[in-house]
Amino acid sequence: MQIHGVVPQAPFVGELPQEVTCVGIPTSAGVLTAAFIDEAVAGIVPKAESALEVHEVPHAGQQPEPVPALLVPGFTGSKEDFTPFLPYLAERGRSACAYSQRGQADSAAPKGVENYRLADFVGDLIEVARAMGASVRPIHLLGHSFGGVIARQAAVVAPELFRSVTLFSTGPRPPEAMRWTPLRQRLLSSTTGKKLSAWYISQFLSSDPRDELIAERAMVTSEDSLMGAAFILARYPDVSLPLRQSGLPVLITHGVGDTVWPEQMHREEAALLGARYEVVSDAKHSAQLENPAALADVLAAFWADIEAGRN
């Protein structure tokens, strides 16, 4: 897997899992940070060579390299929500890249809530996909929660960039609980609200390195980003029909205990799209952290079937 135009990037918090590399991807929003793993040897094309867009073509009889995947994190999240999960994909022969969306963690954070519209997040995703060479060889796309809202829209806007779409713990339209999200986020994203959140988290810190990550991320994530994402979550459009018309293979998956979007909504969308539907055992809203091996099995099987023409 090659990512074009990248710049060096230090990890946000703590150490990276072995074989995971952190980079910055220049976009219209600024540099978005990303973590990736290659199932073989990670390939980075330096910024000075980014216009080359070189891709190896398999020789006759040689098996093509597995299609890489782009992973998009959810609301209040970042690439770190997938960093521990990347080695599970590599163990199953999959290369993948997760990035922090604009305003998340150590990614670029343009000033002003007007810079956090649905189209802005979608545009970033498309730029990252192109940096991964999707214009030449379409990639698998996965969006988690709010990231699924962005992924769904990106697949409709630029279906030619993607081999498949996985909608992970995300729904086609806002559930009832999301209606109050902008008001809640307005309170939590204020300076006082963020300090209170960080203090509350600090009272329960353990030796788990993710506790440190969550506390640090709560303080540095852009307030404008949180507000923009909150408003999107409360009113984003249902694009199920255009997604079906795109012809892209779709997987809908979530943890068995996930209640953010109703299970019935997931099942109805899967039926409408003709999508594969998988429920991950022993997991709730973030199966990549709660039962990573099971989720990796689901994804690897889906992607392998797509590449073999079995979907």
Predicted features along the sequence, with ranges:
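An N-terminal hydrophobic leader/cap segment in hydrolases
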Residues: 1-26, 35-46, 51, 55-57
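Active-site loop/oxyanion-hole signature of alpha/beta-hydrolase fold enzymes
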Residues: 28, 41, 47-48, 91, ...
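Gly/Ala-rich beta-loop-alpha elbow adjacent to hydrolase catalytic centers
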Residues: 143, 147, 151
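Flexible "cap/lid" loop of the alpha/beta hydrolase fold
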Residues: 152, 156-157, 162-191
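Conserved loop-alpha-helix segment in the C-terminal half of the alpha/beta-hydrolase fold
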Residues: 250-283, 289
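Catalytic active-site module of serine/aspartate enzymes centered on a nucleophile-bearing elbow/loop
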Residues: 275-311
